[in-house]
């Protein structure tokens, strides 16, 4: 598998509070709906992206796909990809996939499984990042789980 980064206690308490109270999440609160944003539109997530740029080559990033999973999960094993192009059979991946666990209170389940059998527990203030094209799965869970997915792209997404 390509690079894997797992960082606990990633943001400061102040940064966490700023994300929780920022209007971006409320204005884009439609869970599981992705949006494509410029660098300037997602300032609240710059600490995350700045870290990612230290460990992945983001020099060609032109847009950032951002969405949240709040007490939801994707069904089944999947790759993060350009969904519109996939409808016509073309498979293109982001530069990387990143998942930031904003708030987690899971009683059971909710682990992230990667194609190489890596299992990652969801933990509040944990950042997980891995390279392109990695198939992954979130197991069913009970409790609450709020994650933010930020995927940098080196091309604009199909519309």
What are the functions of these language-model segments?
Residues 57-159:
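Catalytic core of non-heme Fe(II) oxygenases with the double-stranded beta-helix
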Residues 1-67, 72-75:
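Non-heme Fe(II)/2-oxoglutarate
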């Amino acid at each position: 598998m390509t690079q894997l980064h797992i960082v606990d206690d990633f943001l400061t308490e102040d940064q966490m509070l700023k994300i929780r109270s920022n209007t971006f999440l409320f204005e884009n609160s439609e869970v599981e709906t992705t949006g494509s944003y410029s660098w300037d539109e997602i300032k609240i997530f710059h600490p995350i992206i700045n870290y990612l740029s230290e460990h992945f080559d983001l020099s060609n990033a032109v847009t950032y796909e951002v969405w949240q999973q709040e007490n939801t999960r994707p069904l089944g094993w999947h790759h993060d990809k350009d969904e519109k192009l996939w409808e016509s059979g073309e498979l293109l991946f982001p530069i990387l996939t990143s998942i930031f666990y904003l708030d987690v209170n899971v009683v059971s389940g909710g682990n992230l499984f990667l194609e190489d059998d890596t299992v990652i527990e969801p933990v509040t203030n944990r950042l997980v990042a891995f390279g392109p094209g990695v198939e992954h799965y979130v197991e069913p869970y009970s409790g609450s789980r709020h994650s933010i997915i930020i995927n940098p792209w080196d091309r604009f997404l199909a519309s």
